Amino acid sequence: MAGGKIRKEKPKASNRAPSNHYQGGISFHKSKGQHILKNPLLVDSIVQKAGIKSTDVILEIGPGTGNLTKKLLEAGKEVIAVELDSRMVLELQRRFQGTPFSNRLKVIQGDVLKTELPRFDICVANIPYQISSPLTFKLLFHPTSFRCAVIMYQREFAMRLVAQPGDNLYCRLSVNTQLYARVSHLLKVGKNNFRPPPKVDSSVVRIEPRRPGPQVNKKEWDGFLRVCFIRKNKTLGSIFKQKSVLSMLEKNFKTLQAVLASLQNNGEPALNTTSMDLGDQSMGMEDDDNEMDDDDMEMDEGEGDGGETSEFKEKVMNVLKEGGFEEKRSSKLSQQEFLYLLSLFNKSGIHFT
């Protein structure tokens, strides 16, 4: 109108959600570790690096609203998606209902750590980072073999998985994981690739279980590594002089000797002591980040009131000297060196569970 103000109209916002990111009006909870992949190029890269075959059954853990699920369905034969959040389950079902993918998608609602997993060829997972360790070992100990797992982890956890002897992040988790699998770092993922963005960067790691698996008693191996990594930068000689360590080992030693003596008196055949389980003193294979730095605790070297004897202490030290391990540090030892040292202890009747 003449003499009046011209009002500029604001462009109308589109009601259509971006085609690359399926939102569905769901709010995501950071407290539950819900961070949905929103970068389609990253989704494509993960699928490509997984090496999926058209005949593969794919286990997807934490599918969210299905951005990655769609690409997995396009690449493989079937997707079995395990999702805890009932809202996400409904969103997945709604998204693929009436599409060519609907009969190739099976959704299981539940906690993946408590769910009996079916047979699968490949696992692809974008998980809450708080379940990283227990989920990793659940997969590694899965009763049926699978080709690989491609998993999104918090970056520091991922770098601990792939760390090598001498690396700052080399730890019990590194040795444990690499005993059971070949592990490789695939991608570094910035926090802005997620909705909502997490506080830390992430990494995608490929895990390929070793077949056949290692011939080692899991509890014995884990108990042994827990001792070795009490303080990974101290010498093994210092670690194995600790009263608490000597007391535990001597208790196991005496228990084993009593069992063997009882069997001998009853005329029963000798046991394979390298595979014996003398009681569950370990806490499982999960990484609990209990390794200590040099200033975290004082050493409790020498004899104490725990029942350990100077003779047994000498026996333990002789094992370390025999293998040339007394002055070595866990932070520098390879997997094969750990296996060799454990075999020397077992050969001397010394056990860690």
UniProtKB/Swiss-Prot annotation:
Task: Show the ranges annotated as biased composition (Acidic residues).
Answer: 285-308
- InterPro entries recorded for this chain? KsgA/Erm (IPR001737), rRNA_Ade_Mease_Trfase_CS (IPR020596), rRNA_Ade_methylase_Trfase_N (IPR020598), rRNA_adenine_dimethylase (IPR011530), SAM-dependent_MTases_sf (IPR029063)
Q: In which tissues is it expressed?
A: Expressed in rapidly dividing tissues, including root meristems and lateral root primordia, developing cotyledons and leaves, petals, anther, pollen grains and silique abscission zone.
PROSITE patterns (alphabetical): RRNA_A_DIMETH, SAM_RNA_A_N6_MT
Q: Which Pfam families match?
A: RrnaAD (PF00398)
Which segments carry the region annotation Disordered?
A: 1-23, 270-313
Q: Where is the composition biased (Basic residues)?
A: 1-10
Q: Which residues bind S-adenosyl-L-methionine?
A: H35, L37, G62, E83, D111, N126
What domain of life does the UniProt record list for this protein's source? Answer: Eukaryota
| PANTHER family, A to Z | DIMETHYLADENOSINE TRANSFERASE, DIMETHYLADENOSINE TRANSFERASE-RELATED
* Described function: N6-adenine methyltransferase which modifies the AA dinucleotide at the plant nuclear 18S rRNA nucleotides A1785 and A1786. Required for generating appropriate patterns of gene expression during root development, including the cell-specific expression of transcriptional regulators involved in root hair and non-hair cells patterning.
Anything else known: The inability to isolate a null mutant suggests that DIM1A is essential for viability.
Which family is annotated? Belongs to the class I-like SAM-binding methyltransferase superfamily. rRNA adenine N(6)-methyltransferase family.
What is the protein named? Ribosomal RNA small subunit methyltransferase
Gene name, Swiss-Prot/TrEMBL: DIM1A
